[in-house]
A protein has these predicted regions:
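Residue-level recognition of single "structural anchor" positions
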Residues: 1-297
Length: 297
């Protein structure tokens, strides 16, 4: 397609709705066409621009069907612009997006959630090599309490590959309900390769981690200096939440963590974050507004 995309490239590449639909069609069927209804591999030109019609059952599928662009309340050109803006270094708030695209706050909020949904980790690529792990909290100040406070702050666990002892590789971050072994250990086991060299601080929760990871070890935090690279990523996350989004509720907190990790993990990609994000968008079916706002009790 093209390498890292800047604003001028974007404007030249996506001039109108047809150029967006053509690109989306190429992304959606880049690995070949298969009819969703009957499995036929042969297609003809569909009813609408860049849609495909099954040669067997005549099922007609548009490029936007089964993607976050399905039944949009605004033009696909605006939607592409929104994806491009969210693929930039820091992204933007839904409030800013609503002003930039001249759409309602509710519509911008929903579109942001759909993009974040596409940014969620696939879970197919465990962290490898040396992996540093630490827990942290986000939110406003609360009264000093003994031990690890379980107040209203949002609790999180970050895991990061550390290359040659100083460079951060891929990261993964998830919200946690508490700091108990039975909560944290399964998350680490799902996210980190078994042969990884897991390094944590001396918090008691991690004292049995060696039973799960043979190369696991604990070291003194020394006020964070022993995990400087990991803590820098945590500070970057906190700064991004405060500076761009100002506030995120408990129910959608994981979506913001996913967005931060997605962007961080693709910072050096040859084709840029926009290409990676569009690849995801073209292959997943988005949730409805009702599904995205269905909070757990």
């Amino acid at each position: 397609m093209f390498s890292t995309l800047n604003a001028l490239d974007f404007q030249q590449q996506f001039r109108d709705s047809n150029s967006c639909l053509e690109y989306l069609s190429e992304m959606k069927w880049k690995d070949g066409y298969t009819c969703r209804k009957c499995g036929c591999l042969i297609y003809t030109k569909g009813y609408t621009p860049f849609s495909r019609r099954c040669a067997s059952c005549r099922y007609d599928e548009s490029p936007t069907a089964h993607t976050i662009f399905h039944k949009l309340k605004f033009s696909i050109l605006k939607a592409f612009h929104g994806v491009f803006r969210y693929s930039r270094k820091k992204g933007m708030s839904s409030y800013e997006l609503s002003k930039e695209l001249s759409i309602s706050q509710k519509t911008a909020w929903l579109f942001h959630r759909k993009i974040q949904q596409a940014m969620a980790s696939s879970g197919k690529h465990p962290l490898t090599g040396e992996v540093h792990i630490d827990e942290f909290v986000t939110g406003g100040p609360e009264p000093i309490k003994r031990g690890r406070s379980l107040g209203r702050k949002k609790k999180s666990l970050m895991m990061a590959e550390v290359i040659n002892g100083k460079k951060i590789g891929r990261i993964y971050c998830t919200k946690i309900a508490n700091y108990k072994k039975e909560t944290i250990y399964p998350i680490i086991q799902r996210t980190v390769a078994k042969d990884a060299r897991v390094v944590t601080d001396e918090f008691p929760t991690y004292d049995k981690l060696k039973e799960k990871f043979k190369k696991a070890k604990q070291r003194r935090s020394r006020n964070g200096s022993a995990f400087e690279n990991l803590h820098q990523q945590i500070m970057n996350l906190k700064g991004w939440l405060r500076g761009i989004h100002h506030h995120c509720g408990e129910h959608h907190y994981q979506l913001y963590l996913d967005e931060f990790c997605f962007r961080t993990n693709r910072r050096n990609r040859e084709h840029g974050i926009f290409y990676s994000l569009m690849t995801r968008i073209a292959s997943i079916q988005s949730k409805t507004f009702k599904e995205l706002t269905a909070f757990a009790a």
